[in-house]
Amino acid sequence: MNDFVFYKKRDFGMLISDTFVFFRKYAKNFFSNYLLINGALFILIGVIAAFMFIFYDVYSNNWPLLLLIFAVLGVLSAFLVLFVICFPIAYTQLLEKNADRSSIKAKELFVVIRKMLPRAILFGIISFFIILIPYFILILVLARIFGHQIILMQIASYFAGIVMILFMQQFMLVYVKDGLDYFPALRKVIQELKERFWDKLGATFVMNLIITAFSAAGIVVPLVLYFTIMLLIGIDSLIGLSLLIFTLVLIGATVVFIVSNFQIFLQILIHLGEKEEEHTDDIDLIGKHVEE
């Protein structure tokens, strides 16, 4: 039986701890489905990239073919990012609707994700012009203000980045998951973030540090393995070297994508916490109907 409470306002500590509680409970089912749904697309991108590296000399002067390959990689990568972001949202949504379930099937997840994709794509396109361009302008302004004060610039940029992670993920959840129009969703998110803002921002900051640490390990360990293998045995074959690089990059990227789920789920907990009163009212209403 699913005894995890989704609709609950959480403070800083509970947001962090309950994120790990959720993954301790559902990790096996969650990540098996995650790899099943996203793995094929991820491997396809890796294989195309590996072949590009191996046979680069063959088509390096063929610009139309080169541009086509880059375009295909770009489209596949965009869809991979969308699937990665939508997956935990879809998984949680299915558990919300079926409180007694302890596992979800990949087919169900794919159906929900497929329905989310059009709004997710539209959200990305609109936000690029409405949110991201002004954000990049803000970063340039900060760079001009702080000038050569590199440390202050890095602190200000990092703080702005954490705020942006919190804001954009909450914005996407309201727009994609709740189905509000763009600007009503924007107003709702701004209003919601005013409540317990520092709890939400602090939890986002700490989770980002945790993810960065695991991601760094996922990148550094393959690099150490690469240099160790090259130093001890060496690989003369271009194909062998390419396969080695591909395998190590695949390992590192897989770690990065997997740990990103912790941040996304934390944002889902923040989002669902705003619905606690609404959900409680629904339960009370059902209870009244039963009594009648």
Please report, for each region that a protein language model flagged, where it lies by residue.
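Juxtamembrane transition segments at transmembrane-helix termini in multipass membrane proteins
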Residues: 2-6, 18, 55-67, 80-101, ...
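Interfacial aromatic "cap" segments that immediately flank transmembrane helices
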Residues: 3-4, 8-9, 13-43, 103-133, ...
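Residue-level signature of transmembrane alpha-helical entry/exit and packing/kink sites
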Residues: 30, 66-70, 74, 119-120, ...
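Transmembrane-helix bundle segments that line or gate the permeation/cavity pathway
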Residues: 37-38, 44-53, 77, 81-88
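Long, highly hydrophobic alpha-helical transmembrane signal-anchor segments
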Residues: 42-67, 119-154, 232-236
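Generic hydrophobic, aliphatic-rich segments that mediate packing or membrane embedding
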Residues: 71, 75, 84-91, 105, ...
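Short, surface-exposed helix-loop/turn micro-motifs enriched in polar/charged residues
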Residues: 101-102, 148
